[in-house]
Design a protein with these regions (language model features):
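Cytoplasmic-side transmembrane-helix entry/capping segments in multi-pass membrane proteins
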Residues: 31-40, 60-64, 82-94, 157-168, ...
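Membrane-interfacial segments at transmembrane helix termini in multi-pass membrane proteins
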Residues: 246-306
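Structured cytosolic domains appended to multi-pass membrane proteins
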Residues: 287-399
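Transmembrane helix-loop junctions at the membrane interface of multipass transporters and ion channels
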Residues: 104-118, 182-188, 215, 222-242
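C-terminal ends of transmembrane helices
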Residues: 16-29, 68-87, 142-157, 200-213, ...
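Mobile "lid/hinge" segments at catalytic clefts and subdomain interfaces of large enzymes
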Residues: 209, 223-267
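Transmembrane alpha-helix boundary signature
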Residues: 48-61, 73-84, 99-117, 184
Length: 399
């Protein structure tokens, strides 16, 4: 296959990825967006395998089959409530893949056309170092995020003195190591960069509380994209550069939107200080309370005299798997002629779009699910705001 044909196919795949992002921006077109993404990835993989000299198609095919089987098994077994930790786990694999590709390019540069071992061009070394640095941070940060979301690690923020200063010093040390690596190409320095970057990834995520995990997941998504973009420059792969930049930019923009919605700074997210604030509670009552049980009909009966209801779901709804009961309540209210809508805060749940996924699973009509900017101005004219499992969003100081 000629290089011109490869460039055309890569460009076509990149366009399909852009269409996929466009489709995934709305629930009604999300299925079409997924199809665009799948077709684009298949074309990219086939083009790469036909253009590059592959040592063994059997090995590549076996790896694809094993990976596909594992992915299919996970997709069939995973519950909707566990999607955030699944996304975090996938991000960790992207970061780890970037590190492995960088290591392969460093130890066998001739296979990638960037020189020979010990005599790699400085520009390639810089690109390799940046991709490795971001990939290692993405890997360790995503592993810790997975642990927090899965409950393996405490979801509470872990804060200590001089945290930002320590993170900044580690970052400066990594930059210094990169300069050393570019100058002498030492394998020891290469692996030191990886280990220190992994440490920095942990330190960036540990001060972030569970309620703020959507921003973390989005930011790690951005990191994984930039890691892939950096490795794309090392491999001179235009498609990897384009797709990495798409993922990196979209993740960064989404993180900014969510941070702004919570009246917090995106800089705190990057530095690992997001969600570390703890509000003082005026009362501390740990005594057992009586559980009041009810069903969708009971809740609808209380609200039936209202003309309009806005339902604000949060992570508590996901934990209780109450989305189906919530939809039943909404259906009952609509039969009474009540205007029912769902308000989705950008950081509700544990990942971007978490509430949208759960409400879609419960077959809530797409037109009733509105984002913050679309519905925020309607709250003063609405009789009832029904908050379910979203107290940390409506009042971040609540405990």
């Amino acid at each position: 296959m000629s290089s011109n044909m490869v460039a055309i196919l890569y460009l076509f795949s990149a366009l399909l990825f852009i269409f996929a992002l466009r489709g995934l921006s709305h629930p009604e077109s999300s299925r079409r967006g997924n199809i665009f993404g799948i077709v684009g990835m298949v074309i990219a993989i086939i083009t790469t395998l036909l253009f590059k000299s592959v040592l063994s198609y059997v090995e590549i095919g076996s790896a694809i089959l094993v990976g596909g089987a594992i992915g299919t098994f996970i997709a069939l077994r995973i519950e909707m409530t566990a999607l955030p930790q699944l996304v975090a786990a996938f991000h960790s694999l992207v970061g780890l893949a970037a590190v492995f590709v960088a290591a392969a390019a460093f130890y066998d540069p001739s296979a990638f056309g960037i020189g020979n071992f010990g005599s790699i061009g400085k520009s390639s070394l810089i690109e390799m170092s940046i991709g490795t640095f971001i990939g290692a941070i993405t890997f360790s940060g995503s592993v810790l995020a997975f642990g927090k979301l899965q409950g393996i690690v405490s979801g509470k923020p872990i804060v200590f003195k001089f945290q930002h200063i320590i993170n900044a010093l580690i970052l400066i040390f990594v930059i210094f190591l990169i300069f050393l690596f570019v100058s002498n190409q030492s394998p020891n320095i290469f692996w030191t960069i990886i280990l220190v970057s992994i440490l920095l990834g942990f330190l960036v995520v540990i001060p972030i509380g569970g309620a703020d995990m959507p921003v973390v997941v989005s930011m790690l998504n951005s990191y994984s994209g930039w890691a892939a973009c950096g490795i794309g420059f090392t491999l001179s792969n235009n498609l990897l550069i384009i797709t990495g930049a798409l993922v990196g930019a979209s993740g960064a923009i989404l993180s900014y939107i969510m941070s702004k919605a919570m009246n917090r700074s995106i800089i705190n997210v990057v530095l690992g200080g997001f969600g570390g604030e703890q509000a003082a509670s005026s009362t501390s009552d740990n005594s057992d309370k009586i559980v009041k049980q009810g069903n969708a009909e009971d809740a609808a009966y209380v609200l039936k005299n209202a003309d309009s209801v806005i339902i604000v779901p949060g992570y508590g709804m996901a934990v209780a798997q109450a989305q189906h009961a919530l939809r039943e309540m909404g259906d009952i209210l609509k039969k009474e002629g009540i205007n029912v809508r769902y308000a989705i805060h950008p950081v509700a749940g544990r990942m971007p779009g978490h509430m949208n996924v759960l409400l879609a699973e419960a077959n809530v009509p797409y037109e009733e699910v509105l984002e913050l900017d679309e519905i925020n101005h309607d709250f003063p004219m609405t009789e009832v705001s029904f908050v379910i499992g979203a107290n940390d969003v409506t009042n971040p100081a609540a405990k």
